[in-house]
């Protein structure tokens, strides 16, 4: 009986300690980050093991690279319900997101470019458009 109680206490302790770790993310510079849910976000605030952010590129971000000025991203549409956004957004935002999500669903394998200095997000792009834009912007990441 005491062994069982010890196991329960250890399990509870492990759960408690790991729940306080916060959100895992990789800093991409200028407050941009890749977070564990496979999104690229712009961090607005970080305090008390909580992360507040604006979503920039939705899941599934499978690959990314960055330098001092740009972040380049490879995203795959996974067919999830994540892209069925709710009707809670205002009309301008909802229409904009629907148009972007429709394009993501159509392309499926999307590329993005984020200019960290101007906060400009270019995408979703097909591979050939992405390569052309990288040449135009002299991106060599």
Where are these regions (language model features)?
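Structural motif
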Residues: 79-92, 107-112
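Short consensus segments that form the blades of beta-propeller domains
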Residues: 99-104
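Sec-dependent bacterial lipoprotein signal peptides
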Residues: 1-20
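Short, surface-exposed, polar/charged, turn-prone segments marking secondary-structure boundaries
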Residues: 92-93, 141
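N-terminal export/targeting and maturation segments
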Residues: 18-70, 74-76, 82-88
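Compositionally biased, intrinsically disordered low-complexity segments
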Residues: 8-13, 64, 86-88, 107, ...
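C-terminal partner/receptor-binding element of secreted or periplasmic proteins
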Residues: 105-141
């Amino acid at each position: 009986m005491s062994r069982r109680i010890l196991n329960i206490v250890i399990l509870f302790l492990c759960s408690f300690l790991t729940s306080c770790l916060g959100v895992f993310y990789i800093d991409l510079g200028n407050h941009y980050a890749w977070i564990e849910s496979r999104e690229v976000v712009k961090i607005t605030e970080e305090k008390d093991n909580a992360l507040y952010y604006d979503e920039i590129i939705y899941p599934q971000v499978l690959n990314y690279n960055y330098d001092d000025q740009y972040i380049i991203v490879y995203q795959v549409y996974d067919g999830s319900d994540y892209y069925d956004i709710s009707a809670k957004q205002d009309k301008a935002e909802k229409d904009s997101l629907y148009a972007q999500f429709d394009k993501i669903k159509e392309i499926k394998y999307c590329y993005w470019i984020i200019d960290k200095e101007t906060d400009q997000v270019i995408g979703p792009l097909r591979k050939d458009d992405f390569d052309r834009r990288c040449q135009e912007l002299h991106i060599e990441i």
